[in-house]
Amino acid sequence: NNYYSILAQAKDTNDSVRFKYEDAYRKVTSGTKGGSSDQLGMYWQLHLAYDDGYNFKTYEDYGEQRKNLIFARIDSYARDISRAPAPDGVKLTLDGADKDNKLMRLACAAAEKNVLEFFTRWGMIPDAVTRKYAEQFDAEERTIYYINDEARAYRAEGGSSIAESVEVAATAHQDETDPGRVT
């Protein structure tokens, strides 16, 4: 699996992964449906968003792995769906789902968040069962489809978002001689 090889090679910098973030950002802003040749970036971003330890961190036992690694939880729920959270009583089911919908459901369970916006940005289309399962979780408010290694390293080192303290002001004027022009 390419995810594990990138995990072994990545050094918490954007230039140490085997895909280009520019290509990932192009995909998540394109509105296109369907898979991407940069899908490794999608899996990697889930790791970046939900795993707090550094890439080289090892854990003493499977319980610690499940607690700290999203793909350990995804694997656990794929093997035993009865372990998956169901806060509003909607149980996880994988029956009849295609591979994309299985992944979306498992990721929602593992993150305990509705992460469908993330997958939609990556071109996946959730079915009705996936939407119903995901809707019982709070929506992921972070734009995790923009996360990169350096942002995660910043978070791991105790950094926090400055978004709440930043104010942005802009002024626009319509050109009187050319109404289609705004400056």
Residue ranges of model-derived segments:
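Detector for Asparagine
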Residues: 1-2, 14, 55, 68, ...
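Zinc-dependent metallopeptidase catalytic helix centered on the HExxH motif
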Residues: 1-30
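Non-catalytic carbohydrate-binding regions of carbohydrate-active enzymes
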Residues: 22-102, 108-111, 124, 140-141
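Generic, well-ordered alpha-helical scaffold segments in large soluble proteins
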Residues: 4-7, 46-49, 118
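Beta/coil-rich, acidic/histidine-enriched accessory regions frequently appended to metallopeptidases
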Residues: 95-183
